[in-house]
Amino acid sequence: MRYRQGDKDALGELIQKYQSRLYTTLLKICQNPDDAMELCSDAFVKAVENIDNFKAESSFYTWLFRIAVNQALNFVKRKGLVSFSSAETAFANEDEPERVEFASQEASMPIDQLLEDERKQVLWRAVDSLELHHKTMILLRDIDQMSYNQIAEILEITQGTVKSRIYRAREALRLKLLPYFEGE
């Protein structure tokens, strides 16, 4: 890693490379732009302070992401914030919008778009009502499309635990959505 070797420009490159994606994820968790920016900055500071602890067993981004997500989850727990209800606004600046697009590409008629918008709202209300650990799994796996291995590294749990938590999170979400979609 160039920063470890004294290349001070490398830090700026890392921030430029990862800040937007990290900020977007943190915004999804804490739902406040100022808090997300502060958590993002804090994550970079903590990473720089602990750069000697980075073992390169995983990617730098995975290590940085673990720091940031842990800080965000602690922040949310401390503040008692568990709302994802305005999550769609967190996707407005998403670098890769195709990863979070729930609308059908065929929804070209205004009524079709209205129905798709309603489905999104129902989905986010259901996600909002999940317990924090379930929301985290939905966010990391289904929204950020991280691998089981990446999630395991970030949350410092086994892949088996990741898989079972994702299954339980999806099942909880399915049960919350079932009454709405039963007629379809």
Segments from the language model and where they lie:
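Sigma70-family region 2
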Residues: R4-Q5, K28-Q31, F44-S59, R78-K79
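Structural recognition of an alpha-helix C-terminal capping motif at a helix-to-coil junction
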Residues: T24, E38-V45, S58-N70
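Arg/Lys-rich amphipathic alpha helix in sigma70-family domain 2
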Residues: D52-A56, R66-A87
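Short, basic/polar amphipathic helix motif occurring as a linker/hinge flanking DNA-binding modules
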Residues: V76-E101, L114
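Helix-turn-helix DNA-binding module
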Residues: Q121-T161
